[in-house]
Amino acid sequence: MLQRLNCLLMQAGIVITDTQKTQLVQLVELLHKWNKAYNLTSVRDPDAMLVKHILDSLVVSPHLHGERFIDVGTGPGLPGLPLAIINPDKQFVLLDSLGKRINFIRQVIQVLGLTNVTPVKSRVEEYQPDVGFDCVLSRAFASLEDMLSWCHHLPSEQGSFLALKGQYPEQELAQLPANIRLVACHELRVPELEGERHLLEFKHIQPE
């Protein structure tokens, strides 16, 4: 699997350490093992997990600005865990309301020795951080309108929202609230993944 990961990383132009590569392989092995009992993802094949979960998360990394991030509706830690593995200098809170997902993330943290990940079991609208985050991450979580509404209290004053989407969500963007601005849209290329991937960045419009 390590050889396969190396090939995908090369295609994506992503350079990481050997230790980080080993940790990513361990993550896939743990996800594959837990998935048999706890049904954490519909992707069953470890090889497909490398593309659809690991690489699909890693391509977001160049667009992470700041030090403190929250991954809302993280599921089994995606994209939070892969991003935390290759960004050990950044802090990640992984939020989900399902206990089995948070238990899996805790196991990954323990096995991989991650010190920059904090799992939190909570509904996003009920979670109240002491300090706002530099960025709120979302992948396959909800519609843009719901995500921005439920997470409005999470970023700092200068913080942003990053939403990972498939096709460009023209219809969803037309329904954005007036106090939210789309500041960037990045087309992402994920090796061997069919279909479009877009990363949309939003910010609150500060009242003058």
UniProtKB/Swiss-Prot annotation:
Question: Which organism does this record belong to?
Answer: Aeromonas salmonicida (strain A449)
Q: Which GO terms describe its cellular component?
A: cytosol
What the entry lists under Gene3D superfamilies is as follows:
Vaccinia Virus protein VP39 (3.40.50.150)
Under the heading SUPFAM superfamilies, the entry gives: S-adenosyl-L-methionine-dependent methyltransferases (SSF53335)
Which keywords label this protein?
Answer: Cytoplasm, Methyltransferase, rRNA processing, S-adenosyl-L-methionine, Transferase
Q: What is this protein called?
A: Ribosomal RNA small subunit methyltransferase G
Q: Which HAMAP family match?
A: 16SrRNA_methyltr_G
Q: What is the lineage of its organism?
A: Bacteria, Pseudomonadati, Pseudomonadota, Gammaproteobacteria, Aeromonadales
Q: What's its catalytic activity?
A: guanosine(527) in 16S rRNA + S-adenosyl-L-methionine = N(7)-methylguanosine(527) in 16S rRNA + S-adenosyl-L-homocysteine
Where's it mainly located?
A: cytoplasm
Q: Which top-level enzyme class is recorded in the Swiss-Prot or TrEMBL entry?
A: transferase
